[in-house]
Amino acid sequence: MALYGIYGSHTTESCPLNNIQSRKIVLNTVKDFDNIANKNRIKILEQYHSALEHTFIWIVDTENAHSIERFMIDSGWAAFNAVKIVPLGRYQNVIEACKKLGT
């Protein structure tokens, strides 16, 4: 398993706070969200949203980016969000790599 960041954004017009279709997706999906995640072998660690910026970042643990792609489609979030999937590492790993490289 590996850590990934799911960075997403949508327009003001497609925001679930403003758009009834997007809101329906969010409210309908919330009932099965954990099941959809489990089906795609994803463990959701954190979810952060900036409502007025219309952006979000979710931190997940999964085997590969393809699982995330399928999860975003299955959950409906890909219907109104542009999504970027980014592999993540812990900051401490950067520090250790710098120490090994020296100055």
Predicted regions and their residues:
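Short S/T/G/P-rich N-terminal loop/turn motif that feeds into the first structured element of a domain
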Residues: 1-54, 63-67, 88-103
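Conserved RNP beta-strands of RNA recognition motif
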Residues: 58-59
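Short, conserved catalytic or adaptor-binding loops enriched in Gly and charged residues
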Residues: 35-37, 75-78
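Conserved short beta-strand edge segments in small beta-sheet-based binding/regulatory domains
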Residues: 78-90
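Short amphipathic alpha-helices in soluble, non-transmembrane regions
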Residues: 68-76
